Design a protein with these regions (language model features):
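A short glycine-rich, Lys/Arg-flanked "PGG" loop and its adjoining helix->strand segment in the class I
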Residues: 432-445
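Conserved beta-strand signature within the Rossmann-like core of class I S-adenosyl-L-methionine
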Residues: 445-453
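Glycine-centered, small-residue-biased loops immediately flanking beta-strands
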Residues: 158, 345, 447
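Class I S-adenosyl-L-methionine
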Residues: 233-241, 248-315, 325-331
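PAS-family sensory modules
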Residues: 2, 478-523
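Conserved acid/base catalytic micro-environments in cytosolic active-site loops
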Residues: 1-277, 484-493
Length: 523
């Protein structure tokens, strides 16, 4: 008989850093959990946190059932309980679960039953709390819960495992994650533990020994530039190294020199690595307090005194799949309605990832967005469809999406607002400095720069004045001493005779690219 010893906080801390695995399942999940844990060795060095969809009105016996399938202790999670390696923790019924500093946090769900996404909620918190040590697993189940959680884990440098839909009793959740492109591994449940342990070992080796093989890393970066046209040499080496290691682990390669040769021999892997390096993590109204500060402290002054024929111009570089852009568009639309302003707002939303831009242009998002969008906003600005929610035309038509490399392509100009959140944290100081100057160049005098809470303008107090240090809102200052020496390396932009006037709507096509967009709407 297994004694269910729960680790104390001191014991958990003494065990050091270790991977934490979040497993989500719905219908058919019990069978999948059993098969999974029968193949997990007791001394595996990982903690497992289970988030099944449970009946909120009945006590759960899942811990007793799963204890038969593993030698590890299986316990029902308690509030503030620290997780420790070689242990299994199960969410209680009718509770929402997150993790903070390695300890379980429980709360009463705010959403009514049927609208809850407990797997997404936990995996998102796991990504934020554990970063590259987070592992997300989606098993059998209906619906889409877990898809956005896996996206957060991948964006934080973690790894995701999804049950092969052909082996799942219900394939809805696995299929959703795979179709969205958020599955690092797609495997039958029985094969997951071995692959998970191998991946954890490979990533641990690379984490403890950051990329020191400069020649191999340079060969990889040069190959990426030659094949994709994009230079990642000014991205932080730790970030690049982790993402290369994640691709290496999928091919059971532990040596970067070997992986460099593998890339040269397998051109398709170059594209896979390129997609791996594209940081694509976003959500509607991410950091709600920051959006509240923008709405209360910045936008009213920005709107004040604008005539009806004014065109307020917003650029969202690194827009990913468009949630941030549409959040800003909704926020501005609401405030304009409340204050009686009737000028036009035009968004230029750009990203390097062609697939992400395709999702943004379609403006259709999964049902999971109910976690991030208030019910009144869902009803006002979205149309419910079979696959999720579509952004309404009145918001969608404000935005032009285009493919752009913000690092090498010239910036837009004469902008009122630049919103670039969670991109510069991945850049080396020199490139970060160039980008801050580029944003200053792009903004009108008094224009606003909106960054994420983890970013800053660095040592550029001569270019920007803080509006909110907490929520990283800055006003561009264009004094005589302010430097505006931005030298873009891409093609120069000039006015074309057939350019549309600023207030005229831009026709959006599937093929809209930055160069074409520039000719039509920039000047």
């Amino acid at each position: 008989m297994v004694t269910r010893k729960v680790a104390t906080k001191r014991e958990a801390e003494a065990s050091g850093a270790f991977p934490i695995v979040g497993l989500g399942a719905s219908a058919g999940g019990l069978e999948a959990f059993e098969h999974f844990f029968r193949n997990v060795p007791r001394d595996n060095g990982m903690a497992f946190v289970l988030v099944p969809h449970l009946d909120p009105g009945h006590a759960s016996i899942l811990t007793e059932i799963l204890q038969r399938s593993t030698a590890m202790p299986v316990v029902e999670a308690q509030h503030s309980m620290p997780v420790a390696p070689n242990g299994v923790y199960v969410i209680p019924p009718n509770r929402e679960m997150t993790i903070f500093h390695g300890a379980i946090q429980l709360s009463v769900p705010e959403q009514p039953r049927g609208h809850r996404m407990p797997i997404d909620a936990f995996l998102r918190s796991l990504a934020e709390d554990q970063g590259e040590r987070a592992i997300g697993v989606i098993l059998s189940g209906t619906g889409t819960d877990g898809t956005l959680g896996l996206r957060a884990i991948l964006g934080a440098g973690g790894v995701s495992f999804v049950q092969d839909p052909a082996t799942a009793k219900y394939d809805g959740m696995p299929a959703s994650a795979i179709q969205a492109g958020y599955a690092t591994y797609v495997l039958p449940v029985e094969r997951m533990p071995e692959a998970m342990l191998t991946s954890a070992r490979t990533l641990a080796v690379n984490r403890e020994s950051p990329p020191t093989d400069g020649s191999s890393l340079n060969r990889i970066l040069m190959l990426l530039r030659a094949v994709t046209g994009n230079d990642f040499s000014q991205y932080k080496k730790t970030t690049i190294g982790r993402r290369i290691a994640r691709r290496m682990s999928q091919h059971d390669i532990e040596n970067m020199e070997v992986y460099a040769r593998y890339l040269k021999e397998h051109p398709s892997e170059v594209q896979s690595l390129f997609k791996e390096l594209l940081i694509n993590v976003t959500s509607f109204f991410r950091d709600p307090e920051a959006f509240a500060a923008l709405r209360t402290d910045v936008l009213p002054q920005m709107f004040a005194g604008k005539p009806e024929d004014y065109v307020l111009r917003v650029w969202v570089p690194g827009c990913a799949t468009g949630e941030e852009t549409f959040s800003l568009a909704i926020l501005m639309h609401e405030l304009m309605g409340e204050t009686g302003h009737d000028f036009k707002v035009q968004f230029y939303s750009t990203d390097l990832d062609e697939d992400a831009i395709g999702v943004a242009r379609a403006a259709i998002y999964p049902p999971n967005i109910v976690q991030d969008v208030l019910p009144q906003r869902l009803q006002r600005f979205f149309v419910k469809e079979e696959v999720g929610y579509r952004v309404k035309k009145e918001i969608r038509e404000k935005v032009v999406f285009a493919i752009q490399n913000v690092i090498k392509d010239p910036p837009f100009t004469r902008l009122d607002l630049v919103s670039c959140r969670n991109l510069m944290i991945y850049l080396e100081p020199e490139l970060h400095d160039r980008l801050v100057r580029a944003f200053h160049y792009a903004l009108k005098p008094g224009g606003v720069l909106f960054l994420s809470p983890s970013e800053s303008i660095g040592d550029h107090d001569d270019l920007f004045a803080p509006l909110s240090r907490e929520w990283k809102l800055y006003r561009a200052t264009h004094s005589v001493g302010a430097t505006r020496d931005v030298t873009p390396v891409g093609p120069s932009w000039s006015s074309e005779s057939d350019s549309k006037p600023p207030g005229e709507p831009v026709k959006i096509t599937k093929e809209t690219h930055l160069a074409e967009l520039t000719k039509r709407v920039l000047l």
